[in-house]
């Protein structure tokens, strides 16, 4: 390991970002002082400000760093797929599995991200809004394009639920499951394995977005999808 005093500027930035994730997750954005961030990173406040002129810029860099993990690599692969009912199934499974299981994406990184998100929502939601601004626009657009493709192929049963809200509702179902499963003793005993819980939640969500039962049966293979990451 390099001597801390001899780290390059880029290595120093990366080290600071890695060091402060847990602090932000524990105390939130507003509850964290620059002194605490500097102490966690093992640098002075002056050096911290040299690399990150504000807490907001450090927050943004932390989010960018999180976007380099396995989950976001899969996210980008999914966005490259052609819009279709099959893509819709993959998208819903990915979201639910990421929140309910998470093991494929790295438990430590996932735990920090989830804690950051929950803490953010209990405060001013700045971290969550930043994440949405950077990642959800393309995702929601792909989701809507896939709904249109499924409808054109006769694989979607139209409902009164607006198409531009359906991707959000899928996310909220998955996020709520994650919160209830987060404690060491889950808040709800679903009496099924996590694999089966994912499958059931995905089927529920796919019905909600409008896919027909025969379409779900045709494209949804949870065992195969679990091997994609």
Language model: regions and residue ranges:
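Hydrophobic/aromatic-rich alpha-helical bundle segments in the mid-to-C-terminal region
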Residues: 4, 107-110, 114, 128-138, ...
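Helix-turn-helix
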Residues: 15, 23-65
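Hydrophobic/aromatic residues within well-ordered alpha-helical segments
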Residues: 55, 62, 66, 92-95, ...
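Hydrophobic alpha-helical connector segments
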Residues: 61, 74-112, 163, 167, ...
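A short secondary-structure junction motif
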Residues: 65-73, 120, 124, 146, ...
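Helix-loop "lid/cap" segments that line or gate small-molecule binding pockets
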Residues: 94-107, 115-123, 205-210
């Amino acid at each position: 390991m390099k001597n801390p005093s001899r780290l390059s500027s880029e290595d120093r930035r990366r080290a600071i970002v890695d060091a402060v994730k847990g602090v932000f997750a524990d105390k939130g954005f507003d509850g964290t002082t620059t002194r605490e961030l500097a102490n966690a990173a093992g640098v002075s406040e002056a050096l911290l400000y040299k690399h990150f002129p504000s807490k907001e810029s450090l927050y943004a860099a932390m989010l960018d760093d999180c976007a380099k993990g396995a989950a976001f690599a899969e996210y980008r692969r999914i966005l490259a797929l052609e819009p279709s009912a099959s893509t819709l199934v993959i998208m819903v499974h990915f979201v639910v599995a990421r929140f309910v299981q998470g093991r494929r994406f790295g438990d430590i990184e996932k735990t920090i991200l989830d804690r950051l998100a929950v803490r953010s929502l209990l405060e001013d939601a700045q971290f969550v809004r930043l994440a949405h601004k950077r990642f959800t626009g393309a995702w929601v657009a792909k989701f809507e394009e896939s709904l249109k493709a499924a409808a054109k192929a006769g694989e979607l049963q139209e409902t009164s639920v607006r198409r531009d809200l359906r991707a959000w509702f899928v996310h909220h179902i998955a996020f709520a499951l994650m919160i209830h499963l987060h404690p060491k003793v889950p808040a709800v005993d679903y009496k099924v394995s996590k694999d089966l819980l994912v499958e059931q939640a995905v089927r529920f969500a796919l019905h909600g977005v409008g896919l027909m039962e025969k379409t779900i049966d045709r494209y949804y293979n949870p065992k195969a999808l679990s091997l994609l990451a």
